[in-house]
Regions:
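Accessory (non-J-domain) regions of J-domain/Hsp40 co-chaperones
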Residues: 1-7
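A short Gly-Trp-Pro
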Residues: 7-134
Length: 134
């Protein structure tokens, strides 16, 4: 993990590999990025909650989801206290990484080009999320 934080849920790498699909492991544990438009959650607009695929912590409510046109599920606000951020200096730029506050799984990045009321765009990897209908 890029961060030195400690988390409520901590597992050794072999256990994460057993619990997650190879692609989930690559994104959540190794800070990967799925291909744009590859996740069915990008176009999911049902009522419900988006949970961390690593630990099932509710992260986003469906009423904060919007179509950003980027090919990744995007939200304008997380559930209070559900995510943490850290500075990501990879790819020759500075970005704000978003990770699950409970297991530390990499979710995506947050940008300041989102809609009102926050002006933020939480650009998430769909493979890092689970959608649970209300």
């Amino acid at each position: 993990m890029a961060t030195t934080e400690t988390f409520e849920i901590s597992k050794p790498e072999p256990e994460w590999r057993r619990l997650l699909t190879p692609e989930q492991f690559r994104v959540l544990r190794k800070h990967g990025t799925e291909h744009a438009w590859s996740s069915p959650l990008d176009k999911e607009y049902g009522s419900g909650s988006y949970l961390c695929a690593g630990c099932d912590l509710p992260l986003f409510a469906s009423d904060t989801k919007f179509d950003s046109g980027t090919g990744w599920p995007s939200f304008w606000d997380p559930i209070e206290g559900a995510v943490r951020t850290s500075t990501d200096r990879k790819l020759f730029m500075v970005r704000t990484e978003v990770h699950c506050r409970r297991c530390g799984g990499h979710l995506g990045h947050v940008f300041d080009d989102g809609p009102n009321p926050t002006g933020l765009r939480y650009c998430m990897n769909g493979i890092a999320l689970k959608f649970v209908r209300a």
